[in-house]
Curated annotation (Swiss-Prot):
Reactions performed catalytically: GTP + AH2 + S-adenosyl-L-methionine = (8S)-3',8-cyclo-7,8-dihydroguanosine 5'-triphosphate + 5'-deoxyadenosine + L-methionine + A + H(+)
EC number(s) from the headed UniProt entry: 4.1.99.22
Protein name, entry field: GTP 3',8-cyclase
Reported function: Catalyzes the cyclization of GTP to (8S)-3',8-cyclo-7,8-dihydroguanosine 5'-triphosphate.
Binding, S-adenosyl-L-methionine: Y55, G97, S148, M219
Residues annotated for GTP binding in this entry: R42, R93, T124, K185, R292, T293, R294
Highest taxon of the lineage: Bacteria
Record: residues binding [4Fe-4S] cluster 2: C287, C290, C304
Binding site for [4Fe-4S] cluster 1: C49, C53, C56
Domain Radical SAM core: 33-251
InterPro entries linked to this entry: Aldolase_TIM (IPR013785), Elp3/MiaA/NifB-like_rSAM (IPR006638), MoaA (IPR013483), MoaA_NifB_PqqE_Fe-S-bd_CS (IPR000385), MoaA_twitch (IPR010505), MoCo_biosynth_MoaA/MoaC (IPR050105), rSAM (IPR007197)
């Protein structure tokens, strides 16, 4: 069995357990040096997953983070409090790996829901196991979910995820809708070979079920570093595949800092109208309006999905640092955020961590 190393980038502040000095403002919004304000926090709860999508993980053999390196629920609750009350975070999304594999998920959601001002709380999940927990998550304070689903073709699903779990995901979507975790959004990363066919049926399915589809361009975040720009199924390809089957027009509502470009969809008299979005992270990057900050399952702040440096908050927590020191380290990390991800630059270097160990 081939074992793929997880890979950890350069970590700032790991050894000394103290905040890193910078020119970052000491209070107010969580700014970077280009004037962007981070209000959206992505929190990874685990690097483990029960699917094995090829664009994210190898078929087998990925080393997991040791359990003692992962943040516990009390540590997560404290960092959430600092983020919301001191850094101005207004939206918290829990991710993985697969966050439903984190036993303390409901506890952490409840901790976020108790904060004032209360942030919007959402979850990105593969949907396996969601049907059984959707009601409890809603009771804990979860507002809505995004479910990753790349196709509604069972054979294609099994080929992409290396698991035959499509029925479980569909049940999870229905469970989320029944629990009021709406709008239920579907995140799709399209396979270069089957995606043009899959996206037509996937959009039709989402319109019929009342879900909102988001098609996400595949990014260079796979564990095997096999991503190639010339194999990308980009946003223009997606629209070209859909236009023969649906009437599409741009959503006139202001986009703001949202990553998705939204389209209004008319599918004809037999299918409800709706909307869908395309997140063109590669072909039409939106880095200039990015409002995200990221916390990995092992307590590292990443200013960008494609960062090559991380700032260690777990070390600060476990060294007994006060809220002020943790806040300062977080602000320093975000102040150093690059202008863009650089995917289309000839000198681009893929992050050492795969997506499963960063959080989407």
């Amino acid at each position: 069995m081939t074992v793929t190393a997880l890979g950890v980038p350069t970590v700032r502040g790991r050894s000394e357990g103290s905040a890193i000095a910078s020119d970052a403002p000491g209070d107010g919004p969580l700014l970077d040096r280009f004037g962007r304000s981070a209000t959206d926090l992505r929190v990874s709860l685990t690097d483990r997953c029960n699917l094995r999508c090829g664009y994210c993980m190898p078929a087998e053999g990925l080393n997991w983070l040791p359990g003692e390196q992962l943040l516990g629920p009390a540590e997560l609750a404290r960092l959430l409090r600092i983020a919301v009350t001191r850094l101005g975070i207004t939206s918290v999304r829990f991710t993985g790996g697969e966050p439903l594999l984190a036993r303390h998920l409901e506890e952490v959601v409840a901790a976020a829901a108790q904060l004032r001002p209360r942030p919007e709380i959402s979850l990105t999940t593969n949907g396996v196991g969601l049907a059984k927990r959707a009601a409890a998550l809603a009771e804990a304070g979860l507002d809505r979910v995004n479910v990753s689903l790349d196709t509604v073709d069972r054979a294609h699903f099994a080929a992409i995820t290396r698991r035959d779990r499509l029925t479980d995901v569909l049940d999870g979507l229905a469970g989320a809708r029944a629990a009021g975790l709406t709008p239920v959004k579907v995140n799709a990363v399209l396979d270069p070979e089957t995606g043009r066919q899959d996206v037509v049926e996937l959009l039709r399915f989402c319109l019929e079920q009342g879900y909102q589809l988001r098609v996400i361009e595949q990014m260079p975040l796979d564990a095997g570093h096999q991503w190639r720009r010339n194999a990308l199924l980009g946003s223009d390809d997606v629209l070209a595949a859909l236009q023969p089957h649906f009437r599409l027009r741009p959503d006139p509502a202001p986009r703001g800092s949202a990553p998705a470009e939204l389209w209004l969809v008319d599918a004809g008299p037999d299918t409800p109208a709706g909307k869908f979005g395309v997140i063109a992270s590669v072909s039409h990057a939106f880095c200039s309006t990015c409002d995200r900050t990221r916390l990995t399952a092992d307590g590292q702040v990443r200013s960008c999905l494609f960062s090559t440096e991380e700032t260690d908050l777990r070390g600060l927590l476990r060294a007994g640092a006060g809220d002020e020191a943790i806040e300062a380290a977080w602000r320093s990390a975000m102040w150093a955020k690059p202008a863009g991800h650089g995917i289309n630059n000839p000198d681009f270097v893929q992050p050492q961590r795969p997506m499963s160990a960063i959080g989407g």
